[in-house]
């Protein structure tokens, strides 16, 4: 397995890359995992916390891969997974898709998806398909995404 270097895209499967966030800690391990998925265009899963350098790393990764970022999905709205979505969307003109924000005061209240995703739905990610799987438990709005052609599950936490 390749070394995890924050900000650098690491291939994990055909049409899937991981970019490690720069927020190591007790709750995040080496940092939040952000993913870029797609064949003709990219979907970012979990853009991470507000961190301009991480946003730039995701944009540079897309440039290196040679595909535009068209969508941003989050697995849940904890502050280490979704707050970076707004800056990334503004920089890439990507659409925001994912869960609603629970009204418990513990979530990223800046998250506002253009489209709410539901269990069983399928999302086209530039020629690669993700199936939405509702997995409440860690937090009530938690979603996982199954990359159907690779049988690869993006779980968030």
Residues of each region from the PLM?
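Conserved beta-strand hairpin/beta-sheet module of binuclear metal-dependent hydrolase folds
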Residues: 7-65, 144-155
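Residues at the C-termini of beta-strands that transition into short coil/loop
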Residues: 20-22, 100, 136
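Ser/Thr-glycine-rich phosphate-binding loops at phosphate-binding pockets of nucleotides
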Residues: 47, 73-76, 135, 139, ...
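Catalytic, metal-anchored helix/loop core of enzyme active sites in primary metabolism
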Residues: 2
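Core dinuclear metal-dependent hydrolase active-site scaffold
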Residues: 18, 122-148, 152
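Active-site HxH/HxHxD metal-binding segment of metal-dependent hydrolases
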Residues: 30, 49-131, 151
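Short, small-residue-rich loop/turn micro-motifs
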Residues: 100, 156-157
């Amino acid at each position: 397995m390749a070394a995890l270097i924050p900000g650098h895209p690491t291939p994990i499967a055909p049409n899937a890359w991981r970019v490690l966030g720069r927020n190591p800690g007790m709750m995040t391990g080496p940092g939040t995992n952000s993913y870029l998925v797609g064949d003709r265009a990219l979907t970012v899963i979990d853009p991470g916390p507000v961190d301009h350098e991480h946003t730039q790393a995701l944009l540079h990764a897309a440039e290196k891969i040679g595909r535009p970022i068209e969508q941003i999905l989050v697995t849940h709205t904890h502050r280490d997974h979704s707050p970076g979505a707004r800056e990334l969307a503004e920089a890439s003109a990507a659409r925001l898709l994912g869960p609603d924000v629970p009204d418990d005061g513990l979530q990223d209240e800046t998250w506002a998806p253009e489209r709410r995703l539901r269990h069983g739905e399928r999302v086209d990610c530039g020629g690669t398909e993700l199936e939405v799987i509702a997995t409440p438990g860690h937090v009530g709005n938690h979603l996982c995404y199954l990359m159907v052609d690779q049988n690869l599950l993006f779980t968030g936490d």
